[in-house]
Amino acid sequence: VVADEAVSALDVSVRAQILNLFVDLRERLGLAYLFVSHDLGVIRFVSHRVAVMYLGRLAEVAPAGELFKQPLHPYTQALLAAIPAVGDGTTSIFDNPARLLEGELPNPIDLPRGCRFASRCPYRMPHCDEVEPALREAAPGHAVACHLYTEGGTT
């Protein structure tokens, strides 16, 4: 089942009911979902595996629990760092100092060579501007498209 922003326009109580229904149907009927959402809280609740995209390319694919605990791609890290943790709102759910993305968002009609995230990446290397990183397995079941996790990278 493909669910594209299936609960984004719903109020909180209806959203919770629909999400619980998705989970119940998945467990009872063995359904698989491709659940598209910009709401990472929803993704965390309904997903076993998560794929993060940036400007139409996969940045990272991992089991949901691992991705939310140990994101590898700088974009995924920034997304998670922007989600406030429950409490005073000064910390994020990802145990890393929250960092705002800087730099210009590339023009989606005239995309740059190399990594699409390079202009906003805090770890940008010269290689990033020239070569688009391939999606590679950095850990078992955890793939990332980032030069930090390839030969010559820092990790």
Label for each model-derived stretch:
Residues P63-T155:
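Short catalytic/signature loops enriched in Gly
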